[in-house]
Swiss-Prot record:
Keywords: Cell inner membrane, Cell membrane, GTP-binding, Hydrolase, Membrane, Nucleotide-binding, Protein biosynthesis
UniProt-listed Enzyme Commission number(s): 3.6.5.n1
Organism from which the protein derives: Acinetobacter baumannii (strain SDF)
Predominant localisation class: membrane
Positions with a binding annotation for GTP: D23, H24, G25, K26, S27, T28, N140, K141, I142, D143
Enzymatic reactions: GTP + H2O = GDP + phosphate + H(+)
Membrane recorded as keyword: yes
Gene Ontology MF annotations: GTP binding; GTPase activity; guanosine tetraphosphate binding; ribosome binding; translation elongation factor activity
Domain of life of the organism encoding this protein: Bacteria
Domain tr-type G: 11-193
Membrane topology annotation: Peripheral membrane protein
Subcellular location: Cell inner membrane
Protein's name according to its UniProt entry: Elongation factor 4
């Protein structure tokens, strides 16, 4: 639906994003803004309007950044165009945040007035300050009886180091004070700079694939303007496309026919090639190809790798297409084909963390209707061979033989943890159990900020969940990869009836290997259904077996028909049964259920 375009003077535009920790009320505040500026009628309002993915609404988290254009009339009578981007708060999606910030001049830092500052808000806030944005702190959830605005203002100033004495307070749930937030925002956040008469220069912030429209790109116009019918040039591919539709989200898809410097909106040019408009690229018009490219985004490196395999082999091609479509929308996803003896053909995929992996797998299963099995996730290890070559190992099957390896190194993550003083002991114990080395500790009011260096393999598995449970949910975490470090690593193979099952192998530290081997073997014993013969499950490092358990055979009572009778007769029947089981074992194969593959992921420490 096209509508007459309100041409807004560039000095009346405000581009900002909302950054906050998980559950501090970003999406709710966004809902209030939309309601107050009349973006949607009351009947269309629903909680978390911008979290359009079913999965986002279910889990109550924001995964994708979403943009909205609203018109707000300030008490001074001026009408302002607000373009705002709702960003994710979870540590796995921090790259989404840095992309959104590139399109803005300011950021609202939403802090829960009861919980105070958390690690993720600190990390995202620093990203914003580094990119030169104006950061406006806002205290949310002021209606809660346990809200302590003075303490939290003090925390913001002490931990993040930005002025917060005049920070607006509001309650996004009830709508109290939200009007004040909008006023302050217009006064504090600077207007974008840009020349509308200059040649077009626009940055692609995000793109996604629509089966009918092709690639839809979310862009921020730096200079010039783009109209429907223009011939646009994508700088990195050098290809030109005719623009078929231009507009904004308010939050509904609204065509405006033109976007001018300073604005954020969408551009559709019927690009059917999935990689036709990469995120972070620059768009200009085909008549001005000499326009410089804008600095893009740094490529994020996957931290966790896992194999994903379709349960039905005929789904392999649809699975490849689904991954490609997801990859436009989720630039951190990496994949390459892989085959496994146990699971057939599939892809080795790289993710940012365990939550990211779960989300991707669920999106593939829901949006593309696939049934998938995943193998155990591993981080990337570095091996130096005796010849001096460096190899990167992202799967246990690629682990080279011990005889050729000079040195094995594992990735180390620097973890910044913010935790209230009373839980400090528990958190320290957890970090040390995870082979962490303490680097720094600062006391900030009631909170303690500690820095540990912990092997990435320990962090990505379930560290976040454990951290939350040992601190009753108060500790928060932000981590980043710093270096590779030599370590005593081994590959633990799982053998079922003497045959290696490649999808169950794992790489771990030598000190943990025995313990994890025993735990895994015991868990597998419960999950593999009983067969007609004994099934031996073993864990081994090289040729040395470190753990074993047996799934006992089911057997018929062959003596049921001998009432009394001769003992030699009974022995003969039992011997005959034993012989049969032995023959069966030679030819029988064991079906391993999907749960058994998942057991590897959940082996307790």
């Amino acid at each position: 639906m096209a509508q007459a375009k309100k041409s807004v003077d560039i000095k009346n535009i405000r581009n900002f994003s909302i950054i906050a920790h998980i559950d501090h009320g970003k999406s709710t505040l966004a809902d209030r803004f939309i309601q107050m500026c009349g973006g949607l009628q009351d009947r269309e309002m629903q909680a978390q309007v911008l979290d359009s993915m079913e999965l986002e609404r279910e889990r109550g988290i924001t995964i994708k950044a979403a943009s909205v254009t609203l018109y707000y009339t300030h008490p001074n009578g001026q009408e302002y165009q607000l373009n705002f981007i709702d960003t994710p708060g979870h540590v796995d999606f921090s790259y989404e945040v840095s992309r959104s910030l590139a399109a803005c001049e300011g950021a609202l830092l939403v802090v829960d007035a009861a919980q105070g500052v958390e690690a993720q808000s600190v990390a995202n806030c620093y990203t914003a300050i580094e990119q030169g944005l104006e950061v406006l702190p806002i205290l949310n959830k002021i209606d809660l009886p346990q809200a302590e605005p003075e303490r939290v203002i003090h925390e913001i100033e002490e931990i993040i180091g930005i002025e917060a004495t005049n920070a607006p307070t509001c309650s996004a749930k009830t709508g109290l004070g939200v009007e004040g937030v909008l006023e302050t925002l217009v006064d504090v956040i600077p207007a974008p700079t840009g020349d509308r008469e200059a040649p077009l220069q626009a940055l692609i912030i995000d793109s996604w694939f629509d089966n009918y429209l092709g690639v839809v790109s979310l862009v921020r116009i730096k200079d010039g303007r783009i109209r429907k019918g223009d011939k646009m040039l994508v700088k990195s591919t050098g290809q030109t496309h005719i623009v078929t539709s231009v507009g904004v989200f308010n939050p509904k898809h609204t065509e405006t026919g033109v976007l001018e410097a300073g604005e954020v909106g969408f551009v559709i040019a019927g690009i059917k090639d999935i990689f036709g408009a990469p995120v972070g690229d620059t768009i200009t018009l085909s008549t001005t190809p000499e326009v410089a490219s804008l600095p893009g985004f740094k490529k994020v490196k996957p931290q966790v790798y896992a194999g994903l395999f379709p349960i039905d082999a005929s789904d392999f091609e649809p699975f490849r297409e689904a991954l490609q479509k997801l990859q436009i929308n989720d630039s951190a996803l990496f994949f390459e084909p892989e085959s496994s003896d146990a699971l057939g053909f599939g892809f080795r995929c790289g993710f940012l963390g365990m939550l990211h992996m779960e989300i991707v797998q669920e999106r593939l299963e829901r949006e593309y209707d696939l049934d998938l099995i995943s193998s155990a996730p591993t981080v990337v290890y570095e091996a130096v061979t005796k010849k001096g070559d460096t190899i990167y190992i992202d799967s246990p099957s690629k682990m080279p033989d011990g005889s050729v390896v000079e040195d094995l190194r594992e990735p180390i993550a620097e973890c910044h943890i913010l935790v209230p003083q009373e839980y400090l002991g528990n958190v320290m114990i957890l970090c040390i159990e995870r082979r962490g080395v303490q680097k720094d500790m600062k006391f900030l009011g009631n909170q303690v900020s500690i820095t540990f260096e912990i092997p990435m393999a320990e962090v990505v598995m379930d560290f976040f969940d454990k951290l939350k449970s040992c601190s009753r949910g108060f500790a928060s975490l932000d981590y980043n990869f710093i270096r590779f470090e030599s370590s005593s690593l081994v590959k633990v193979d799982v053998l079922i009836n003497g045959e290696k099952v490649d999808a169950l192998a794992m790489i771990c530290h030598r000190n943990d290997a025995r313990h994890r081997g025993i735990a895994l073997v015991d868990k597998m014993k419960d999950l593999i259904p009983r067969q007609m013969f004994d099934v031996a499950i073993q864990a081994a490092i090289g040729a040395q077996i470190i753990a074993r358990s047996t799934v006992k055979a089911m057997r018929k009572n062959v003596l049921a028909k001998c009432y009394g009778g001769d003992v030699s007769r009974k022995k003969k029947l039992l011997a005959k049964q034993k012989e049969g089981k032995k023959r069966m074992k030679q030819v029988g194969s064991v079906e391993i259920p999907q749960e058994a593959f998942l057991a590897v992921l959940k082996v307790e420490r």
